[in-house]
């Protein structure tokens, strides 16, 4: 029989689901005492090369309030050609096409190995993919040139029938006509005036006179084919023209006097982009790709004035309510994000500058629409160029690894309700019997819209057990959840992916050991971290840390083995032993610690809310590898005791790859030993972490910042700030101390944290 660890991994590979608990407490009261909520990390479009889509539509439950999809957990009467829904127990007739089914001739959706299945929907018109570039021209000459080259390169990666458009902005905003042969023509808008969607569409000539009964008909893509084709053209038609147009783009002509910032109308440019797509291609897969090299400095959405002597807001300003433009700008971008999400479009933000660019205010544009957020120093760096190129990578079938306009519908058995979701989604406000009144994350609904998805996009979905304590579930009972994802595939097909899972119920009084053994501490750490980061958006940082600490203490009290008032007796089983360590590193992470970070570090939170379990764990607790002459590279503790003079360290934090040379290694390299034939093994030692780093850099999206440093180097701070400070300037000379690098910090170490946790867990006062 498979261990729980193997069971968890098999389910993740097959269904893209990781639950915090894999045996569920059978009553509401007991579930609340488990501290960590019943929740899962769902990767709706997890890549499955072994899962070809079926070319027919799913069979749905006939009950209007259910509509669950036929799945392997349903009971089937093959003689009567009936099936019973495992969610509402409605008996349903099979459609005529299923007349030949039997125990030995089952459709794929009834086979146990197809707990996840994908359907291709044949009906409905297919729409091309749409890419609308929104380009900042207030860049330095070399930055603008590099960006133009990247955009020209991207045209060759788009499908020939994809529609593409171009908006440029500086002090003014220009919407470029692409249907003109031989001449450049554009519509120019003032960057200071906020325009409604109707005004934008009227000015661009996208509306046509109202006709009787016109309002009753839902908008269809390409309702005004001529009007929209002036601004959005198939790549194969305008490849050469647009390449030339991009090549001719000049820096914003308005002069910038000394001591001033360029006037940058980002808010108006985005508003026009949203209005253009809203009027021409509602409910069609589209990406608005914003490239900006500085903060918006005029018009709606501005985050700082043009006077350089007045700095952009800091966390200190925000705490003191001294960020003059922040609330108004955030409101503007939230309004745009909600409109974009309602139309099924997504907004990507590519912000490359040495100073802040206003990501704090603009973050909702990417967060609510499932768009990408990329932050760099310059468009002329390999970090941006390679990250941008990776957006257009293809899967094993030659299709883009991106999907559009998805809706996620979650169905549960009667003992469960849905509390909410955390991830790149917006609520569709679909109430129903399976929706909980207690919200966690984006709640009050059983359906969410995810406008931009890729194979690693992951949502945290939280549930509530509602079965009462006095109505026991029969022995061997199982709870079920179904995830139904409707989306537009990058091949323009409409598809539905259905994942149906079940887990055993258990009585906590008699089967607590089973529940404990089925605890997934990695998934639980990420799910609790997402809750903490979600709360940090609206609560004070210290309050969030206190909440996380309280939850950790309660969990240790519930599942630890100890004698009252005796910290030395405290033990956690293997299922829980790593969880406190994850919480320790989470408390020190940039997701919760804003000190010494700029407000644009909301970039980190953006990625944490959308990455899968493996990448999220790396963000919480970076991986550290050690290279030495004594053997192959090995993972070592993320601890200052691992920093040794004769070692090379490779640290992966997800956002950075750091190679650190110990003191002796750095001296040998300076002496040039690697160039001497007799020290070839030293040359290989220096090369090994570089090769491994290259492998990570090639696979990661977005591409991490690459840092090569050594003992005493200024960039060694990236490593020193992450390791557990077991050796500091305060305890450096403690008796029996291992050799290692002391960290100059007053932060508590993991050992002190654990000692304090044990004291509180065994205390009867807590």
Curated annotation (Swiss-Prot):
Sites bearing N6-acetyllysine, chain numbering: 564
One MF term in the entry's GO annotations: GTPase activator activity
GO CC annotations, alphabetized: COPII vesicle coat; cytosol; endoplasmic reticulum; endoplasmic reticulum exit site; endoplasmic reticulum membrane
SUPFAM superfamilies: beta-sandwich domain of Sec23/24, C-terminal, gelsolin-like domain of Sec23/24, Helical domain of Sec23/24, vWA-like, Zn-finger domain of Sec23/24
Keyword Transport in annotation: yes
A Pfam family assignment: Gelsolin
Entry keywords, A to Z: Acetylation, Cytoplasm, Cytoplasmic vesicle, Endoplasmic reticulum, ER-Golgi transport, Membrane, Metal-binding, Protein transport, Transport, Zinc
Amino-acid positions noted as binding Zn(2+) in the UniProt annotation, renumbered to this chain: 61, 66, 85, 88
Residues annotated with N-acetylalanine modification: 2
Subunit note: COPII is composed of at least five proteins: the Sec23/24 complex, the Sec13/31 complex and Sar1. Interacts with SAR1A.
Its job: Component of the coat protein complex II (COPII) which promotes the formation of transport vesicles from the endoplasmic reticulum (ER). The coat has two main functions, the physical deformation of the endoplasmic reticulum membrane into vesicles and the selection of cargo molecules for their transport to the Golgi complex.
Family statement drawn from the similarity comment of this UniProt entry: Belongs to the SEC23/SEC24 family. SEC23 subfamily.
Full protein name: Protein transport protein Sec23B
Organism: Pongo abelii (Sumatran orangutan)
Gene name tied to this protein: SEC23B
């Amino acid at each position: 029989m498979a261990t729980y660890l193997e069971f968890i991994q098999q389910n993740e590979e097959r269904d893209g689901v990781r639950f915090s608990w894999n045996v569920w407490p059978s009553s509401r009261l007991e579930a609340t005492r488990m501290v960590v909520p019943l929740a899962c990390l769902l990767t709706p479009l997890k890549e499955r090369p072994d899962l070809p889509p079926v070319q027919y539509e799913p069979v749905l439950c006939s009950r209007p309030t259910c509509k669950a999809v036929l799945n392997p957990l349903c009971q089937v009467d093959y003689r009567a050609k009936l099936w019973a829904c495992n969610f509402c127990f409605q008996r349903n007739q099979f459609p005529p096409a299923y007349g030949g089914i039997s125990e030995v001739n089952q459709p794929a959706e009834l086979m146990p190995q197809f707990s996840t299945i994908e359907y291709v929907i044949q009906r409905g018109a297919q729409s091309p993919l749409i890419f609308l570039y929104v380009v900042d021209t207030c860049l330095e000459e070399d930055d603008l040139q590099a960006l133009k080259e990247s955009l020209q390169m991207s045209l060759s990666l788009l499908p020939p029938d994809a529609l593409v458009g171009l908006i440029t902005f500086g002090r003014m905003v220009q919407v470029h006509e692409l249907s003109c042969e031989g001449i450049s023509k554009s519509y120019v808008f003032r960057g200071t005036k906020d325009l409604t969607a109707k005004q934008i569409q009227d000015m661009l000539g996208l509306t046509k006179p109202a006709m009787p009964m016109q309002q009753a008909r839902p908008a269809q893509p390409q309702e005004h084919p001529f009007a929209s084709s002036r601004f959005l053209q198939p790549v194969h038609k305008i490849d050469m023209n647009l390449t030339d147009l991009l090549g001719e783009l000049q820096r914003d002509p308005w002069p910038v006097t000394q001591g001033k910032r360029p006037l940058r109308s980002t808010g108006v440019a985005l508003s026009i982009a949203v209005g253009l797509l809203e009027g021409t291609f509602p409910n069609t897969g589209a990406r608005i790709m914003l490239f900006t090299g500085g903060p918006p400095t005029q018009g709606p959405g501005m985050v700082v004035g043009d006077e350089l002597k007045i700095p952009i807001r800091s966390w200190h300003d925000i705490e003191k309510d001294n960020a003059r433009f922040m609330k108004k700008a955030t409101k503007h971008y939230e309004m745009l994000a909600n409109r974009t999400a309602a139309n099924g479009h997504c907004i990507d933000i590519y912000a490359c500058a040495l100073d802040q660019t206003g990501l704090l205010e603009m973050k909702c544009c990417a967060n609510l629409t499932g768009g990408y957020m990329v932050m760099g120093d310059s468009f002329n760096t390999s970090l941006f160029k390679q990250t941008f190129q990776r957006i257009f990578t293809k899967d094993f079938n030659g299709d883009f690894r991106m999907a559009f306009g998805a809706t996620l519908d979650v169905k549960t058995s009667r003992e469960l309700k849905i509390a909410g979701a955390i991830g790149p989604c917006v609520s569709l406000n679909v109430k129903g019997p399976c929706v909980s009144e207690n919200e966690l994350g984006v709640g009050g609904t059983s359906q969410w819209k995810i406008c931009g998805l890729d194979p690693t996009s992951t949502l945290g979905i939280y549930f509530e057990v509602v079965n009462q304590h006095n109505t026991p579930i029969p022995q061997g009972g199982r709870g079920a959840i179904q995830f139904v994802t409707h989306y537009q595939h990058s091949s323009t097909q409409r598809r539905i992916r259905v994942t149906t899972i079940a887990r055993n119920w258990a009585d906590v009084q008699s089967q607590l050991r089973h529940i404990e053994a089925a605890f997934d501490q990695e998934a639980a750490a990420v799910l609790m971290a997402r809750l903490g980061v979600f709360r940090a958006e609206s609560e004070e940082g210290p309050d969030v840390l206190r909440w996380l600490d309280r939850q950790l203490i309660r969990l240790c009290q519930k599942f630890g083995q100890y004698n009252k008032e005796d910290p030395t007796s405290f033990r956690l089983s293997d299922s829980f032993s790593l969880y406190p360590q994850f919480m320790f590193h989470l408390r020190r992470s940039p997701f919760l610690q804003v000190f010494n970070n700029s407000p644009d570090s909301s970039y980190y939170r953006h990625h944490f809310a959308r990455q899968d379990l493996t990448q999220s764990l790396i963000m919480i607790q970076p991986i550290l590898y050690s290279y030495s002459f004594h053997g192959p590279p090995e993972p070592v503790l993320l601890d200052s005791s691992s920093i040794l003079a004769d070692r090379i360290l490779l640290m992966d934090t997800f956002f950075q790859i750091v190679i650190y040379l110990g003191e002796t290694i750095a001296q040998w390299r300076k002496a040039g030993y690697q160039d001497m034939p007799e020290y070839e093994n030293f040359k290989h030692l220096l090369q090994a972490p570089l090769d491994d780093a290259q492998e990570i850099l090639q696979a990661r999206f977005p591409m991490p910042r690459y840092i090569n440093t050594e003992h005493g180097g200024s960039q060694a701070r990236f490593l020193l700030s992450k390791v557990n400070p077991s050796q500091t300037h305060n305890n450096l000379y403690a008796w029996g101390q291992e050799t290692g690098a002391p960290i100059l910090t007053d932060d508590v170490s993991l050992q002190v944290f654990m000692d304090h946790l044990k004291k509180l867990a065994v205390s009867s006062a807590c």
